[in-house]
Amino acid sequence: MLEADLFFNYLSVERRFSKHTIVGYQTDLLQFSNFIKDTYEVEDIREVSHLYIRSWVVSLMENGIDPKSVNRKITALRSFYKFLIKTGVVDKNPMLKIQAPKISKKLPEFLDDKKMDALFDNMSNDGNVYEQARDFLILDFFYRTGVRLSELIELKIENVNLHNLSVTVTGKRNKVRQIPITIGFKQAIEKYLKLRKEFLNNLSMNCHYFFTDNKGNKMYPVFVYRIVKANIKMVTTGKKKSPHILRHTFATTMLNNGADINAIKELLGHSNLSATQVYTHNTIEKLKEVYKQAFPKA
């Protein structure tokens, strides 16, 4: 579909969407295209009505797709039709009659201080083994900076400024932000960099990325996910064991220790404050616990 190719190019060049997001949009639009073709024998995007789209949404829900995933697919299709209107391919937008299913708000899961202490106590970082130092620093990096998985993978050596005690991160839509680090964290990074240099020299490798896999190459998402999951599962029975739980932990820890929510928003790279405000719910729950301890008979 020519229109789709132009749309994906538009997302990449003008909107600066990440490759991960574009691949997701491609998958969602292909799924929709196959649905209307198989169900209604429609291949021309100009012939699609809002009734076809509603039917697709219903089929997704009936097949057990969770509302959050359905909303993502609707967002992809909504963006596509906005593009088609903008480029004059269609003159009516059927998405205007489509409502996204409501999502029950869930508080972000995080690890409390005791679990974080146990997490790092369980990990070995005393020796001179590169892989151990790397794995330890990966989890520590997520926890101390709140970066996303994709941001950590794309981090390069020059992005970590130990002189100025800051990390430069390129986030969604190529938005650049700086995250401060402590002197204590600087020392952990220096130890890692020393082992990293020896490790790459032994492999005769020259990798510009800050973290590498076991072969000295750029890491990939599943590689990092496995490292994080393997260690987090040692301290929690919760369902969430992904790198994102450490991002949630970073934000919650900052807020619980008095950080301004607008500052947390900037550190996380959120575009809107509403995305950051979800962490205030966790703080309220903590305040309730403190209150009960102070006034047990209240």
Segments and roles (model prediction):
Residues M1-A298:
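Conserved catalytic core of the tyrosine transesterase superfamily
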